[in-house]
Amino acid sequence: MSKGQTLQEPFLNALRKERIPVSIYLVNGIKLQGQIDSFDQFVVLLKNTVSQMVYKHAISTIVPSRPVKLAMPEDMQPED
């Protein structure tokens, strides 16, 4: 598993579990808002008044409405 996946999953999982509202910016500039309902290797299910399946390759940026506390894997902890 790559480092990108190692960081991506805990980040999306924290957003999902804590029901943190997010803004998702797509590569074409469109802004989507809602809460992460679920995700897998290829898609994110975003819930607002409706549910939207957003393909990860179309996502540029995910911006949480508040700071997210991540449980970092040991191999990614900063060294002293």
From Swiss-Prot:
It comes from the Bacteria. The keyword rRNA processing does not apply. InterPro entries: Hfq, LSM_dom_sf, Sm. Keywords: RNA-binding, Stress response. One of its GO terms (molecular function) is RNA binding. Homohexamer. This is RNA-binding protein Hfq. It comes from Thioalkalivibrio sulfidiphilus (strain HL-EbGR7).
